[in-house]
Structures are given as C-alpha cells and as structure tokens.
UniProtKB/Swiss-Prot annotation:
GO cellular component, one term: DNA-directed RNA polymerase complex
Record's protein name: DNA-directed RNA polymerase subunit omega
Organism: Methylibium petroleiphilum (strain ATCC BAA-1232 / LMG 22953 / PM1)
Biological process annotations from GO: DNA-templated transcription
Job of this protein: Promotes RNA polymerase assembly. Latches the N- and C-terminal regions of the beta' subunit thereby facilitating its interaction with the beta and alpha subunits.
Catalytic activity: RNA(n) + a ribonucleoside 5'-triphosphate = RNA(n+1) + diphosphate
Similarity field: Belongs to the RNA polymerase subunit omega family.
Keyword terms: DNA-directed RNA polymerase, Nucleotidyltransferase, Transcription, Transferase
NCBIfam families registered for this protein in UniProt: rpoZ (TIGR00690)
PANTHER family assigned to the protein according to its UniProt record, in alphabetical order: DNA-DIRECTED RNA POLYMERASE SUBUNIT OMEGA (PTHR34476:SF1)
C-alpha cells in the first residue's frame, strides 16, 4: 500500500489551509456514510487525502460548506 502524504495533495490544492479544510469536510462526509471515490480500507481522513491526491476531490468541497 502506498503511503499518502500532504505533499502529494499540495500539488492539487497548493494552499495548505484550503487543503486541510477540504480534507476535513470530505472526511466528515465519509464518516457520515457518503460513498468513497477511491478504493480504500483506511479511516475517513486518509481516504479523503487519497481522493484529493488522485484528483477526485478538490476545492469544490469548500463551495459545498454551509455558511
């Protein structure tokens, strides 16, 4: 299994603060029962980072956050 790092995700979302917000929101969605977009047996936080690194999820996650 390949290890996922934040550096892998920073190529997709260059701003580290936006990266954390997007990953957190996606991880919360996964823990509430949403279907993952990648094959993963990891915890929601790691799965969210994998989705970002592979380009399945991006900054659009921040547009879905209720104000």
């Amino acid at each position: 299994m390949a290890r996922i790092t934040v550096e892998d995700c920073l190529t997709k979302i260059p701003n580290r603060f936006q990266l954390v917000l997007a990953a957190t929101y996606r991880a919360r969605m996964l823990s509430q029962g949403h279907a993952p977009k990648v094959e993963s047996k990891n915890k929601p936080g790691v799965t969210a980072l994998r989705e970002i690194a592979e380009g399945h999820v991006g900054l659009e996650m921040l547009r879905k956050v209720p104000v």
